[in-house]
Every structure is written in structure tokens, then in C-alpha cells.
Amino acid sequence: MNITIIGAGNMGGAAAIGIARAGKIPASCITVTARHATTLARFSEYGIRTSLDNVEAVKDADIVVIAVKPWIVPEVCSQIRPLLDCSRQQIVSFAPGVSPEDLLGFLEKDGQKPALTYSIPNTAIEVCQSMTFVSRVTATPEQEDEVASVFEGTGSVMKVPFKQLMPGTALASCGIAYALRYIRAASEGGVELGFYARDAVKIVSQTVKGAAALLEAHGTHPEQEIDKVTTPGGLTIRGLNAMEKAGFTNAVIQGLKGGK
């Protein structure tokens, strides 16, 4: 299987590296494109193929991933449309801000529309720790499975109906920034408590990693794990209550709703 990722920015570049690292698809079967050679320099160490020409890059691709900013999508589609083979090639979009109707309209060729699937990873795909959503539009279930298989080994993959794609984006793709903002805030608190900044970041990062590992290992609800730490009258419950008084849970929920 040959994959071409159009766009070597934060998400497209991270996906190319993560897929290569996962090892299911050889790096030599992955091509990533960009407008400038300097953007592509970092991919050589992974054995990923690079190109400055979107048209040439899609010719031999089985799956074409559109990973550019939404306002660049029409331009990219106009470039690759003449070369698309709708009977063979699948399109995967990383741009939920461009509707399926618009995207298929940009790509329609001689009355034919390609198999289209949307996929939303997050930037942790680069280190194979993404939460990636896959949602078919015109693709068959078998084609959707094929797209999902591309992301095997890059973290967790979940197939969802299209109506859940934007909420999923808020929860996981935007959500990684929210998680990092918590780490930043807790680290700043750690500095106030007397730790050097680099040590505080290390402590908080490992604590968050440990919390996630507990949920995965036990299959429990977060509150069950919280209960194991909150002894009556103890420090933890006092800290949690102080956070709630400051609006912690509501702030997180409002942030997720705001990013939807």
C-alpha cells in the first residue's frame, strides 16, 4: 500500500512520522509533500519519501491524505483531481472544517467521486500515542477498515459516525492541548511549591501518564481511582475541593464545548 500525505505541517508531518514508526507500512511506501524543501528535510532520517510536486506524488498512491489547512484544500484538489483514479484511489481528509459535500465537489471528475473518509488524529501520532478517529463518507466499510489499518500502532483508533467527528476533534485533537495546559498549570504550581520548572514538568507529566495507565489497566471510571487516593480529611480531597471551588470541572467542559 502506498500512501501520499499532502501537507507536511504539524498534523501531516506528525502522521507521516508516526505511521513510519509504527512499522505496519514501510517508510518507503509513504510520501509527504510540501511547498518548500526545508519543510521536508526532517523526514529523510525516517526513510520517508518527499516531494515538492503534489501531482507527481499522488500518481502511485493508493490512499491520498489531504492534511493542509482548510483554505488550501480547494487549491490542492484542483491540482490532484486530473490525476485521480476514483476506481482505485481513496481520499482521506484531515480537515473536518471542510464539509464532505464541498470536498467531494472539489474532487469530482467526469461525474465520478472518490471514496472519501475523514480521519482526525492528534499530534501525539508522531510518538505513536494518538487518539485517532476514522469516519467514512462515500467509502465502503471495507475501505474504512483499510484506512483504520493505516493508523494501527500509532495509538488508539476509533471508527465513529460522521456526526461524532467534530465532538471527537474537541475531545482528542484539541484535547491534547487542553491536557498540556493542565500540565503547564500544575507545573507552575509545582514551581510555587518549591520545585525547579524542569523537575515540575517531569513530575506532572509522569503523574498524568500514570493516571492514564491506571484507567487503561483497570478499565475503571476515573472517580473510582480518585476514591483510592482521597482519604477522609486528607490533603487530596482538600485540593480537589479547592479546584472545584475555582470551577475546574466546569472550565474543562466549557472549553470542550467551545472547541466543538
Predicted features by range, described:
Residues 1-52, 56-59, 129, 191-193:
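NAD(P)+-binding Rossmann beta1-loop-alpha1 motif at the extreme N-terminus of oxidoreductases
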Residues 13, 17-21, 45, 78, ...:
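Short, well-ordered alpha-helices that flank and scaffold nucleotide-derived cofactor binding pockets
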Residues 26-29, 87-89, 198:
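Short acidic capping loops at alpha-helix termini that bridge into adjacent secondary structure
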Residues 30, 40, 57, 73, ...:
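Small-residue helix-packing motif on alpha-helices
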Residues 37, 46, 54-134:
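Rossmann-like NAD(P)(H) cofactor-binding subdomain of soluble oxidoreductases
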Residues 102, 106-115, 131-167, 178-217, ...:
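Internal alpha-helical scaffold of NAD(P)-dependent oxidoreductase catalytic cores
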Residues 205-260:
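NAD(P)-dependent Rossmann-like dehydrogenase/reductase catalytic/cofactor-binding core
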